[in-house]
C-alpha cells in the first residue's frame, strides 16, 4: 500500500522548487566586463594614474584616442569602437574623476583635463593619433587641437559646444529625469531610490556622489531603457556602469573651474591646423544654421548634423555616425 505524501514533505518540495526559480528571477545582474579581445591598463600622466581601455589590438594601424563626456567612462565608446577597430588601434580613456581613473585634486584647473590627454598621448608614445571626443571630451580635443597643434593627425568632435562653453546640446547621459537632467548638486534620497526616481548630481559633497554609486545596476539599466529607447542594450549597460563609477567634482568649485573650465573653447576652432569634423545632434533649422555659421571658423573642417539623434548621437544613430566617420577618415 502506497502512503500519501505528508504535508511536511509537500512543503519541502515546494520550497525546493521556489529556490530553483527565484534566484534566476530576482538576483541582480552583474555589470558587464571588458569586451572579449579587449584589454585595459593604467599610465601615470599629468600627476595621476589614468585608466584606459584598448580595443582589439591593431598593431601598425592608425591610433584613435577617445575621450568621453561628463559622468561616462571609456566603455561608453564600445559599440562605436567595434565598428572601427578593424581599421584603427583604439584607446578609450577614463577621464579624471570618472571610471577607474584617479579623482580630481585641489590644484586642478580648466587646463587639467586637456593636459591629461596630452600627457597620455606622450606617455604612450603615440605619433599623431586621431583624437575623438564626445561632449566635454569633444571640447577637450578641440582645445588640444588649438593649443597643441602638432600633437594630433585629426580632430573628431561629437556634439560638443562650439565657440564657447557648452550650448547646443541635446539630452545628456545622466540618469536623473529625462536624459540630461543631471544637476550640478543634489541631496541624497532619504529612502532607497526606485528606478523611476534616481536623482543624479554631477557635483556635490562626497556623501552625495557616493550614494549615487550605490544605485543598483538593474535599476540604472531599467531607467536607461526608458529614457533612451533608441539605444542598444550594450550602450545602456555601460552607461549604467559609468554612473556607478563616477567620482568627479566633490564640490561645485571643481565642477565649475575644472570640468566646465575645460569646455571654454572660445575661438579655438580657428586655430586648429589639422583636418577636423564636428558631428552635431539633430536640431531645428535655426540652430543648424547657427552651428554651420560657427563651423566656418575651421581651417580644414566641416560640420555634419546626425538626423534623428540627440546628444549621444553615437548611441542614437550609430550607422549614420559610422558612415560619416568613414567618409572623413578616407580623406586623411
Question: What is each of the regions a protein language model found here?
Answer:
Residues 301-332:
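Catalytic active-site module of serine/aspartate enzymes centered on a nucleophile-bearing elbow/loop
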Residues 2-15, 22-62, 87-88, 127, ...:
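Alpha/beta-hydrolase fold catalytic core
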Residues 46-48, 53, 95-132, 136, ...:
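Active-site loop/oxyanion-hole signature of alpha/beta-hydrolase fold enzymes
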Residues 167-168, 174, 179-271:
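Conserved alpha/beta-hydrolase catalytic His-Asp/Glu region
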Residues 74-82, 100-103, 139, 165-166, ...:
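Short N-terminal helix/helix-N-cap motif within the alpha/beta-hydrolase-1
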Residues 127-174:
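Conserved hydrolase catalytic core segment
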Residues 275-309:
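Conserved loop-alpha-helix segment in the C-terminal half of the alpha/beta-hydrolase fold
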Residues 54-100:
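Conserved HGGG/HGGXW glycine-rich cap/lid loop of the alpha/beta-hydrolase fold
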